[in-house]
Amino acid sequence: MSVRQGYSPIQMPLLSVFRVITFWISFTFCLGFSFGQNAPKIRGEVFDAVSSQPLIGANVYWEGNTASGVVTGLDGDFEIISVTFPAKLVISYIGYERSVRVIQAKDGEKGLRFFLKPEEMSLEEIIIQERRPDEQIKNLEMGKASVPIETIKNIPALFGEVDLFRSLQLLPGVQTAGEGTTGLFVRGGSADQNLVQLDGAPVYNASHFFGIFSVFNPDALSKVDLYKGNMPASFGGRASSLIDVSLQEGNRNQIHGQGGIGTISSRLTLDGPLFGKNSSFIVSGRRTYADLFLKLSRDENLRNNKLNFYDLSGRFSFFLGERDKLSFSIYEGSDFLGLDDQFGLGWNNWVNSVNWNRVNSETSFFDLQAYYSRYQYIVDINDPENGFEWTNRLSESGIKANWIRVLSDKSTINWGIHSQFYQFSPVDLAPDPESGIGEIVTNPKNGLLNNLFFGLNQNFSPRLSMEAGLRWGLYTQVGEGVEYSYPDDRPERDGEIGTESFDAWEPMQFYQGLEPRLAFRYLIDEQFSVKAAYNRNFQYVQIATNSSAGLPIDRWMLADRYTRPIQSDQISLGLFRNFDNNRWELSVEGYYKDLRNVIDLRNGAQVLFTDQVETEVLSGDGWAYGVETLLRKNTGKTTGWLSYTWSRTWRQIEGVSLNQKYNPRFDRPHDVTLVLNHEFNPRWSAGLTFVYTSGLAVTFPVGSYVVDNQNVPLYPELRNLDRFPDYHRMDASITWRNADKGRKWKGSWNFSVYNLYGRKNPFAYEFRDIYNNDINFNPSEDGDIISSRPGVVMTYLFTVLPSITYNFQF
């Protein structure tokens, strides 16, 4: 079988595969504990004294020697080279009281913990970034965006429901599928090319209400990182981006709570010590009550409808001495839509993970994680003649081990293994006893993916730094299953010439590939840097769908004989400049992305119930390029950002659009975003967002023809030559807070207006007959037809939409 450069099918018995993996595990365990000791270092962690949350980006240095300073990482951890003892170690962080501690030589044998007390801040000291002020200048990361949770909460919200994905859509390089959706399209990649993970476990459907809200409750989150490029070697599996979401650690000192009562939903989060101060918990729940409003309707049919969602999440952490931490994370989310007892659609996610973090020594760290993620949906049609129940389920389980070794103050390496097992259960359509529909059961799909990875961070000089990585993946499609064969290995409808059955765990197809990652940063001065990066990613799962927004019933496909893994290669170059003592940040990033083996549907494709989905899709190439500009203000009474993105996205697939290149639906060349937040005083603040983007690419009919006295639209062979009108919208919010000092119960009222000036942004166009020049005329109910003509009806979701939310803390 011919394949593209970069990966190839190979014949390797599973026993040999497992021998390779076993050798790698043994080797890395030995390597992790056999490195010799380097120059002694002091290690520790920095926490908020009130909430016990780790402080990211705190400054740590020896008194009188700031040049030796370091900053804390994502878990509040740090390592600093020892000096002559005794010596004073200084910990500082904006908005907190400084801590100074005398360190003795023996303190290097154990980890140190610092708890900083918050201090009263003036408005000029308010910051919007949970990071050090010059981070964008000095770090190696390109294409990474971190949005603090407090910033997300300050953005005006649809229905008053603060939303993570809707906030990420405001960042440069991130597109949306249209009004009222949370689907993300990052640098020309489709929605299924984003790896969304919660505490390291993947989430396969990250939206509620058909994409209007994301599944994450911001009250329970500690951080959100979006990687648009230059993904670390320890991550992989998707072609375009990583959205890394982390739950908070619970407060280890006292019970704390927060929540909100909104227009269509309410939420509550509790956290505190579990069994003393060496353990903690956080649990969070959210539920909508949209279905309760339906019961107030005068329409009996509406009163019988149901529309709701809920989600529950939690994290339980146990600190086992000075060196070990064990944490358990859980998430469950569910949606249900019921129409007058005739139709029911439910879908849910179940995600859980366990993480063990160990400090082996001052320079050696180990993380071990196991996880399980499941997504399923059920469709129930209650009809005497055509009733049925349709179910589908997919799951991913995995284990990941990661070793980190600090070789010196200039070099750090990490390496590890990541094994994943995919189970895509069959589509099962079970007809009711009296139904005239036949039973449909498709074959299950299973895949095993084993990855080895290695990364190096190297500082060549104070100006030049490098991050290099290599990831190798071996993918095996395994039985139980059935594989169809076709003439010339080209799947065609009704063209199969045979089948082959495989037993459980019997290998069916192999793919393997190397994924190099490389990034450089050159520091021109303390306020100006240049960065460049290259990365390759492989993706072994894809969605076959005719909806760009993403639906709960989308068909997921595993790589097999006919559907090859996506290969993504991206290069990027960026300029980063800070001004006015790091109050202002300016960045300009350009990128080019090459995609191979992306899929699209044939004309008239039906992918939901077929067992031969490979006959409904075609694969080919894609590419995307663009320039992202971001100007951000970090401190002061007014904070926020202004961004502009120019980008183009293309596909070229044999058998689609007359084999010519075309734009996918989510190609939107121009994107302008403005986000502002202003603090008038400790009680009052206001937020404003403005969004302008090019319209979605679509295919409009070029004419019509008559069938049974009805006009049927005639579509061209060339795809997406037309566009929706440009999209623009302004949102605004005002927040009042109870700022009285010393109160245990703190409340705030948020008043938001979505689509402030009532722009009717198109959601869809319907091409159909218009009777009697009335788009609402129904021939079966409204009388005789006097005239008819082919017409188009535009649907929009929202005009001006006000909301109110009460938020509280205790």
Q: What is each stretch, according to the model?
A:
Residues F35-E125, Q129-R131, R463:
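Periplasm-facing N-terminal accessory domains of Gram-negative outer-membrane beta-barrel systems
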Residues E97, E109-L112, E125-M231, L242, ...:
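Periplasmic N-terminal accessory/gating domains of Gram-negative outer-membrane beta-barrel systems
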Residues A177, S234-F235, G250-I255, F275-S279, ...:
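Short loop/turn motifs that connect adjacent beta-strands in outer-membrane beta-barrel proteins
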Residues G262-R287, E300-F336, G344-F366, Y372, ...:
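Transmembrane beta-barrel wall of Gram-negative outer-membrane proteins
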Residues Q376-Y377, Q423-E434, T476-I497, M508, ...:
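Surface-exposed extracellular loop regions of Gram-negative outer-membrane beta-barrel proteins
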Residues Y591-D594, V613-V702, N807:
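Gram-negative outer-membrane beta-barrel transporters
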Residues R683, Y692-D708, Y727-R729, T735-F810:
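C-terminal beta-signal and adjacent terminal beta-strands/loops
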